Amino acid sequence: TRVPQGGRIRLTIEDKDVDFRVSCLPLMGEEKVVMRVLDTTKGVLTLEQLGFAASSMDLVKKNIDKTVGIILVTGPTGSGKSTTLYSIMHMLNNEGVNIVTLEDPVEYFIHGINQSQIRPDIGFTFAAGLRSLLRQDPDIMMVGEIRDNETAELAIHAALTGHLVMSTLHTNDAIGAIPRLIDMKIEPFLLSSVMDLIVAQRLARRLCQYCKREKAMPEEVVTDVKAKLSKIKPEILARYLPDYGQKPMMFYEPVGCDRCNKTGYKGRVALIEALDVNDFIRESILKDN
């Protein structure tokens, strides 16, 4: 092929329905293909299984109980944002609750949730879909991604009219979602009134639990870690790192064994930053600070 292509393939392999998202890029004399493999039979994981700490899960539960407002999940492409939203929707998926989604594409089918896949090629964009969703009497709306000003404005409007809206953004950290939306021409006073929770995440390779090896941290890393931890209030540090300062800092390094195909890694783990938009942050947004 002479142009980039993308698509989706669904196969049944050993009685498992497996989805492949394929991206092809033409190079000089060859073609580069990247495939993302989605095992649809695994079902939706819980937040705990995804790697959320108890404190982060508490923030999510507190904010989804409000039934109105906006919850955003941010991070780069392939960081597991959609997987986190599926987990949250699964928590909210109860009889009598009308959950409607706009996705690109629908990655997992969840019984009881009304899932719709956008088609930009025929004009069915996130913005066009959101307008229709508002007439579908939804309780909860999930928009796969806020990509432009129009989608952002419609999501804000939906939250202001009594809906819980969940979506994703591409930002480097949680707090970065706020200036990103302001850059999309969202008025700060509107943003401060509807934004409730922002979750930023990354995916890291998980060390193989069978062959990982403990190793002392290099001195320069210890110095850097101590400098960063010194900025944290002592009571918070004691809560999350009760043994800090009582023994040498250690970490684990990959080794490789038959269970991990000699790579030293098996699976991935989510690194989560959950930002509860409290009154202080709301006031800062209003001051555009």
Tell what function each PLM region has.
Residues 1-289:
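Short, flexible helix-loop junctions that flank or precede catalytic/ligand sites
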